[in-house]
């Protein structure tokens, strides 16, 4: 008999309470066991993946799938090596649990500790990438969270084998800590379980993430679009600006931290635009410009439309606009951006400061490519994704983003009555260096 989604979530809830109390050593050992098992059973994984890829290529020929989806779906020995290394890297990261975030004396013998703990049950829904299943499961385990995994049907064979490997490798952990759901209708059931699932992490297209956000009351960690900007100020080192704008678009155009709109101050447009246009042309980047940009470039590029300023291309396409001031650049980004990542290229530190303070984005850079917006590059280790929200976690989200906290109060028969009324004793409320010990 097939286990229902509700039963799987119930099992995950029970497991989450036990997993939160597993030792750091146990979680590390089980992650190493996952890495070893994937390595030992790589032929089985690749065989399953080949079935998914063959079916996907048929859908590609029929015009149902994109080449990008097929590419994301493919696994190889080299890709499995990277997955295995990622799991071992997660195992080696510092334990995010049981950390004393603050310690405060309320009164003599009455001490309050703020301590990091797992979130609980995390539901994740992702498209096309079987490596995402392993990454999310590994990060969930390291942070002491139970996880519900729902991958796309296009990767069903790969996901099923990888899940079985993970489940069997962690047989000594609380049963049900990781659950796989496969049917499309299970997603809607999952979205309605706000009393059982503590956090949802969708990974996929903008439309996909928007659907998740619009159809659940469970907190959602993620972003719908990556409409990132580079602004070239009139005080910029223009050679640096060309290198940054090129790297931000060309180095890996399909990811969410690639630049989509290039803003250029009008005072340097005549000098700068021909240089960056030539570099982009060498890489077959399609440019779409406003009237001022096209005038400088002799109208050799397509005219930008209003939709271009809000588009995440995920491809070798960039929109270019000439602006008359720093203020105009800031206004354009705040109006059209997705609050992901923005960069200013300038030698004027004051303008850089204004740009970084005035923008409402998760990551703001000075003289650096937007492609640095990444958990690994930030030193956070493997990441579960980028969050453009402002509650709980923001920007690249690593292990710490999968934890919350609880308050531990240590007293010695203290009563609230002592601190109330006319003769109330005052609180000391003094922070101190201390660690809560279970």
Curated annotation (Swiss-Prot):
Keywords, alphabetical: Amino-acid biosynthesis, Cytoplasm, NADP, Oxidoreductase, Proline biosynthesis
Subcellular localization, as worded in the UniProt entry: Cytoplasm
Any Gene Ontology CC annotation: cytoplasm
One MF annotation (Gene Ontology) recorded for this entry: NADP binding
Record-linked Gene3D superfamilies: Aldehyde Dehydrogenase, Chain A, domain 1, Aldehyde Dehydrogenase, Chain A, domain 2
Coiled coil stretches, renumbered: none
Pathway assigned to this chain's UniProt record: Amino-acid biosynthesis; L-proline biosynthesis; L-glutamate 5-semialdehyde from L-glutamate: step 2/2
Methyltransferase in keyword set: no
Reactions listed under catalytic activity: L-glutamate 5-semialdehyde + phosphate + NADP(+) = L-glutamyl 5-phosphate + NADPH + H(+)
Keyword Calcium: no
CDD domains: ALDH_F18-19_ProA-GPR
Assigned protein family: Belongs to the gamma-glutamyl phosphate reductase family.
Described purpose of this protein according to its UniProt entry: Catalyzes the NADPH-dependent reduction of L-glutamate 5-phosphate into L-glutamate 5-semialdehyde and phosphate. The product spontaneously undergoes cyclization to form 1-pyrroline-5-carboxylate.
Name of the protein in question: Gamma-glutamyl phosphate reductase
């Amino acid at each position: 008999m097939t286990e229902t989604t509700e039963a799987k979530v119930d099992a995950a809830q029970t497991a989450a309470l036990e997993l939160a109390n597993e030792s750091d050593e146990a979680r590390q050992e089980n992650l190493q066991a996952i890495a070893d098992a994937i390595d030992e059973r790589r032929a089985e994984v690749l065989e399953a993946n080949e079935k998914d890829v063959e079916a996907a290529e048929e859908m590609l020929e029929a015009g149902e799938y994109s080449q990008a989806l097929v590419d994301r779906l493919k696994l190889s020995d080299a890709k499995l090596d990277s997955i295995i290394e990622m799991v071992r890297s997660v195992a080696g990261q510092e334990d995010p649990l049981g950390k004393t975030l603050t310690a405060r004396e309320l009164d003599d013998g009455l001490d309050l500790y703020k301590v990091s703990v797992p979130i609980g049950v995390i539901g994740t829904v992702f498209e096309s990438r079987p490596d995402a299943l392993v990454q999310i499961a590994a990060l969930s385990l390291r942070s002491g969270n139970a996880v519900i995994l729902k991958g796309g049907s296009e990767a069903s064979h790969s996901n099923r084998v990888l899940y079985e490997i993970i489940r069997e490798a962690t047989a000594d952990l609380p049963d049900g800590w990781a659950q796989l759901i496969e049917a499309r209708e299970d997603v809607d059931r999952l979205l309605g379980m706000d009393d059982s699932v503590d956090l949802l992490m969708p990974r996929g297209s903008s439309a996909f993430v928007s659907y998740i956000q619009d159809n659940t009351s469970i907190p959602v960690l993620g972003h719908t679009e990556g409409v990132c900007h580079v602004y070239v100020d009139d005080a910029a080192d223009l050679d640096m600006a060309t290198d940054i704008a090129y790297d931000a678009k060309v180095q890996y155009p399909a990811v969410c931290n690639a630049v989509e709109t290039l803003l250029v101050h009008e005072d340097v447009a005549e000098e700068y635009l021909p240089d960056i246009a030539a570099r982009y042309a060498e890489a077959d980047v399609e440019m779409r410009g406003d009237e001022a940009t096209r005038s400088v470039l002799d109208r050799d590029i397509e005219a930008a439309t209003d939709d271009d300023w809000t588009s995440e291309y995920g491809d070798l396409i960039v929109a270019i606009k000439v602006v008359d001031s720093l203020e105009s650049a800031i206004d354009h980004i705040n109006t059209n951006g997705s609050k992901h990542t923005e960069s200013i290229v300038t030698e004027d530190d004051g303008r850089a400061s204004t740009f970084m303070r005035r923008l409402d984005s998760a990551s703001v850079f000075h003289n650096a490519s937007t492609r640095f917006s990444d958990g690994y590059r930030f030193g956070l280790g493997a990441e579960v994704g980028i969050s453009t929200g402002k509650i709980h976690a923001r920007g690249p989200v690593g292990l710490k983003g999968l934890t919350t906290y609880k308050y531990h109060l240590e007293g010695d028969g203290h009563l609230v009555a002592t601190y109330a009324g006319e003769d109330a004793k005052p609180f000391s409320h003094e922070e101190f260096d201390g660690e809560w010990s279970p």
